[in-house]
Amino acid sequence: MKSSFEWMQDYVTIDKSRTPQEFADVLTIAGIPVEQVEYWGEDIQNVITGKITKIVPHPNADKLVICTLNMGDKELTIVTGATNVREGQIVPVAVHGAHLPGGVKIKKSKLRGETSEGMLCSAHELGLDDSLLLPEERSGIWILPEDTPVGVDAVAQTGLRDVVYEYELTPNRADCFSMVGLSREFAVLSRQEAKLPQVEVQEGSEKIDGKLKVTIDDSELCARYAARMLYNVKVGKSPFWMQQRLRKAGVRPINNVVDVTNYVMIEFGIPLHAYDYDKLAGHELIARRAKKGEKITTLDQVERQLTENMLVIADAEKASCVAGVMGGFDSEVTEETTTVVLECASFKGSSIRKTGRALGLRSEASARFERGLDSEGCVHSLNRAAQLLQQMGACEVAAGVIDEYVRPQEVRRIDFTAQRVNDFLGTDISEENMISILATLGFTTEKHDKVLTAVVPTWRIDCTEMPDIAEEVARIYGYENIQSTRPLSNISEGQEGFEHAVREHISSVLSRSGLNETVTFSFMSVDSLKKLLFKEDDAHYQAVPILNPITEEFPLMRTTLLPSLMDVLVRNQAVKNDRVAIYEIASTYRPKSLPVTELVDENREITGLLYGNRTQASWPYKAEGFDFYDVKGLMEAVLTSLGIHAQLRVSDYAPLHPGKAAEYVVGDTVLCRFGELHPQCVDNYDVAGPVYVFEMYLKDLLPLINLIPDYHKVGKFPALTRDLAVLVPVSAKHADLLNIIREKGGQYLEGVHLFDVYSGEQVPRGFVSLAFALTFRSAEGTLSDADIQQPVTDILEELQEKAGAKLR
């Protein structure tokens, strides 16, 4: 949800001495978190409105023209290549010394021999995203309304100088997905009353009765359906101020009718939809489930297959709208439309969510329906839309409203006492103060002896029980005003479980190695598994579906932590963090069967990610990037600290680079997998790789852990060393060679390590030279060459037989 600081001031008075950030802090502290504050137009200077009075061809360039502009107090001559300029137009002009987004500076110059005293600006050059512009505004100069004053600050005049807030609202606060809802909250926090718009509609002589029929066939999925009719409609552009407010909310203007429905949705949080009345067969609207095999072409001109579980709004012949998700192309409002039906309805949120997910569609409207909305506000929203269109002179309003309200919204009453709330919060707030706080939030309170009953306002669908009342009291009273108190109950010290101790131990090892622990959502999408190259028959796709996901992006319980960490990496790269070293210890979830009928399997995993530079550049040293051996070293450090001896082998794990992937195993049990992320995965996430990752499986580690360190007596006698240089095929695996040496090294072999790799001219094609250092020692006496000759011979013979090795 985005809101404009300028728009907010229609409803509340904001202290000008407070900064925009302080305004955001007030809401955040009270539980309405502001995720981001965008300062629109702050980097734009010296852009003035000017009127084109004369256009002549450039004498030295066929594709350029010379414009003379009235700037109010002077005239300017500007050369442009734009093809949409006309005499009499008012346009934004960047004069000499102007600053534009991206650090662009404008100065007086000559273009093909003619002086240009500035630049005519497009909307894009003033910072507006193309996706928020009308088609005709995406190329050429931005043409401003005819009534725009000349010679004034273009940024202020066009509403581009503003502060836009982006909120990270929790799904339960559906009431705050609107300007009015946010204004109510701020009004309470700043001890004032929100100034809500006064809605009055001047109805015309025509009546809606007899001209439109509305039927609700499925009251489970559609609780209320209200409609108004507008006639003598003139479809065109909406007012400039409305277009700008919609853009700041992230919505692209289309035409005055559609823009008004979107404007009212953002203002009141209740979606509306507009139909061309003359395109509705039988002049009838029916809220019903889709028929078997039914299809609809939606507004994006894509034909979509419907299922019998989906709610549609149909005319007498066919589906005209996917309810709450997207309208139908066949009933779209166009410039030829003269009669419009406005719809405002209350649909079941879970149904809209499932329909949107099945069709791959999500909109501002569906996001609000999914969270639930105030059914009582439907007619009020209809009237507001009719009022706005009427004020534009775009229509007349037919008398009457059709309102089918088959399942009225329940009025919630919550019983509580001041003592229970105070016990719950650890506070000492008076009963009178609680009643006063609730009253400012729209609750009415009745008292019966010591029991208070709060009547919940219809827009607060999240309040259902006493703790909700306590939360409302606490956040308005001020969390910062609640004093710390000691718990009144007896507390006994618990003991740390073994698994918890192991998790803490692993966390300590990874943190000491320079990684940061993260905590992410336990959800994922099928798309994230595809990005990581898991095949469709992979067990990772056997995921637990969520009945009420917090967003459509996360419909499943995760079966791997990798997507979560990749999302963290993407966000960090977006803000130019060039070093990411993170890990997470969390659960993954696998169903025993689908559909889920019993408790799912929950397994703890430790997943990490390394990206960027291990060390930063300094004057004598270059920066060094992470590599395969960093993740390998982390795995060895963890396993060694747990007293686990495992074998290394090549891994074929789908997300990993085929040539840079490994795993540690004990027998057939995989303890961990690690390596470089597959280049295709990196591309799928649009990350500038390489990325190194690891996964450890706690349930497989636990039975093997030996935290009692092995004791090795320090040898009293000297060791003998032998260096073996062998030629082996390049396909030979280092781990296999080590296993052969250890197996045939006999009782005196104390250690072995690879100390040289050579593949120069003296080595045959297809081979590589490996040099191993072998250490032999006896606890009983000094070894002679004869004592170790046989083990060395056995090693060479076994290497030759099993690995095709030759002694150099």
Regions found by a protein language model. Name each.
Residues 2, 29, 440-443, 462, ...:
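A carboxyl-terminal module marker
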Residues 414-580, 722, 775-778, 787, ...:
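Extended, well-folded interaction surfaces typified by the phenylalanyl-tRNA synthetase beta subunit core
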Residues 190-216, 393-421, 428:
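Terminal amphipathic helices with adjacent charged low-complexity linkers/tails
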Residues 3-10, 161-170, 223-231, 364-371, ...:
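Short, hydrophobic beta-strand segments
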Residues 4, 11-12, 23-25, 65, ...:
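Glycine/proline-enriched, intrinsically flexible loops and inter-domain linkers
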Residues 49-79, 150-151, 244, 255, ...:
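Conserved mixed alpha/beta core segments that line enzyme active sites in large multi-domain catalysts
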Residues 1-206, 341, 360, 364, ...:
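Phosphate-backbone binding interfaces of nucleic-acid-interacting proteins
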Residues 115-127, 138-142, 155, 163, ...:
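Mobile "lid/hinge" segments at catalytic clefts and subdomain interfaces of large enzymes
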